Amino acid sequence: MARLRFEHTLAQGVRAQLACFDEMFPPERAAVHRMLARYGRETMWNLLQTKLADNAAKAPDGLEQAQKPWREALLLYNELLAENACCSLAELRIGGGELLAIGFSGRAVGRAKQRLLDEVASERLANEHGALVRRAERLYRSGWRGETDGRE
């Protein structure tokens, strides 16, 4: 793909879809929400349509059964979009300035926002300002900074 000439955004979209194509997830609300947050609305839509088409090609005799989980995931996808579910860092109802005020600094601000998004997408935390602030404060007090290699 590197030698073919594509627009940068098209190439990125194809790479993202290929990266998640083999990823299996149950047709459950939290799983679909996590995938939406990880890959974005457009890539998730394309993934679900591709999965439906792939199943149609692989299992023409048992098409209904093969497509059932992807149809359920598509219904959940549409439900989440209709509810304007939080699926990106920009949609979180807490800003970097508030995380700085709590005490996070530097890269830990971005890591904290990502952690909060993961919890919202897993449906363990509501995307409400007060709930996000309280969770961020608990994370900060616990010493969590999102470091994986000891460097900030």
What are these regions (language model features)?
Residues 1-66, 71:
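Divalent metal-dependent catalytic cores for phosphoryl transfer on phosphate-bearing substrates
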Residues 58-152:
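Charged substrate- and nucleic-acid-binding regions of tRNA-handling and nucleotidyl-transfer enzymes
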